[in-house]
Amino acid sequence: MLAASPKGTVPVLVLANGEVIDESIDIMRWALEQKDPEGWMASFEPGLLADYDSAFKHHLDRYKYAARYGEDPLAHRAAGLAMLLQLDAQLADRGYLGGNVRGFADIAIFPFVRQFAGVDPAWFEAEAPRNLRGWLDRLISSDVFERAMVRRTLWTADEI
């Protein structure tokens, strides 16, 4: 992996022509350019995605991994919640961020929200806005998520 992308982070996609794509959003876009059976690209919102991939991720990391950063996790939880309130407002009259069907923005953003919810599930259930919780529940219980998150047995070197 390091030979393909010196960043040393996942995911990394190496195309047949040798091109390397090492950003999640770019990999999603590439895959959907190949095949987009549910029309997710129709709801592609670069500004919203950039906010969650940068500002929200910043707060998520400092909330989830507070000991690593030495910062007040509650301040970052509050900042993250403020951003989630904006998503909740978008979800007030529709089931998904782009309308009544899931799309690119939903699939790209919900893993961050899922991680945020997982830091303190009881707090999230009590404090996160209702529309947002419903949206997260719909995505977590979706067929797409369940297929992607099948638990596999741990691979060991003995299996070579």
Predicted regions and their residues:
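Surface-exposed helix-capping loop/turn segments at secondary-structure junctions
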Residues: 89-100, 144-148
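Structural helix-adjacent loops and short alpha-helical linkers that scaffold large soluble proteins
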Residues: 37-39, 122-128
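GST superfamily/GST-like fold recognition
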Residues: 97-122
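Long, charge-rich low-complexity segments
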Residues: 147, 151-160
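GST-like domain detector, emphasizing the conserved glutathione-binding G-site
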Residues: 1-82, 88, 92
